[in-house]
Amino acid sequence: MKNIPLIGYTDKLSLRPGETVSFKVSSTLKKSFSASLKRSISADPNPKGIGIIEKDASKYFKTSFFKSRKQSFNPGSYAISKTPIKVSIKNNLNLSVIIFPTLFSSKKQTILAFDNVEIYINSNRATSIRVGNDSISIKEPLILRSWYKINIKISLSGKISISQKNLKNKNKNGLINNGKISLNKVLSGKVSLAAVVSKGISHNHFNGKIEAPIINADGKKIGDWDLSANTNSAFVDSIIGPKLLLKNFPTRAVTSSKWDSSEMNWQHKPGHYAAIHFHDDDIYDFEWDTDFKFKIPNNMPSGIYIMKIKGDGNEDSMPFFVAPKINKTKSKICVLISTFTYSIYGNHARVDYKDNWLNRIKEWNAYPYNPANYKEYGLSTYNYHSDGAGICHASHRRPLFNLRPGYITFGGSKSPCSGLRHFQADSHLISWLHNKELDYEIVTGEQL
């Protein structure tokens, strides 16, 4: 995973006087980095224009220094129970789940994990079950984009059975493999889907859909989750057992094994949309710790501001947008800042991007990073996941390259035009208002 030496983001894009913005920074520098406040007037790096213009705003925030520290991020969506499950087993443990794999990998892909029991797809594309250090697998590989019902039975006597049935191929018998394994009498821990989680970090992400996970001990259900329920939430309510928390926003209300195209609205027939689609590159919130905060002063004018951080020849700019207090507007001109557009297009990796775009970036001293080269930072809803599915969710709670002064959207043009969109292009209006000495205030899409 490629890391940028100095980069950050804010917890909020839209603020008013009296509200506080938090800055979250990752720095691999050996020394501290500085932070200074600027008011952004022009974000266009084109040398044939007025260039990037940023006015000093240190009267509101004095330049300060902060200790460098690297902050990591963990792409990949998964589900994990809010609380642990503890069960004493007298005879046997049964697990079942329905899956629809969408991308194979040379690495293990976890489907369901509980304590030292794990259902996964191995590097040979076969369904496997691990208990402790022992495992067995189905002898035939899975077929991509096919629905499978997986059943596991493990007994304290040491017997284990794994069966797999292709739900769309009624003419083919299910596959079974048996073996011997040692099962602990007591199992305890959180249940996870689509990844195994250790010390809060997820690994071995599954690409595909998961439906109807059930855990049964001695004929009694201890975990049963209907993934078609409350699909507008980041939690999955349980039929039995603890709720599941969804991390990194997997796609909900997707077609499941019973879907037959008879209903296109998931709300009318939720049983046909009872799966969740997980991806190894889902990312929503980096969840970095806060390095410093800034409370917007009452006398700070409405406008576009950036917190510029610098160190060892590296720099980054974190924009935020300050609107006036409600019912305290002074200007006759209001500029709408499209923060929703900025977020949805956040880190849009263009299909026409080429490395020669870096030539113009270097010549213009423009923003040096492009999401096409840093896809692990999460892409936009105009891009695709690693398995080819469209990206459904995007947020500003991560560094957004295209929300930076000097970012060039279209770098391949031979013409002298700036090649801008969104934040940088919108700054043409802001710089014009300043040039004409026209008083204005802003409001963002989030604030409307």
Model-derived segments and their meaning:
Residues 16-20, 146, 199-209, 291-335, ...:
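Conserved, well-structured beta-alpha core segment at the onset of a catalytic domain
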Residues 1, 7, 91, 185-189, ...:
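Low-complexity, Pro/Ser/Thr- and charge-rich linker/hinge segments at domain boundaries
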Residues 17-22, 44-262:
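Extracellular glycan-associated modules
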Residues 30, 38-40, 254-284, 314-448:
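Aromatic-Pro/Gly-enriched surface loop or interdomain linker
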Residues 25, 84, 91, 214-221, ...:
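Extended amphipathic secondary-structure runs
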Residues 11-13, 84, 102, 297, ...:
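Residue-level recognition of the GNAT/N-acetyltransferase active site
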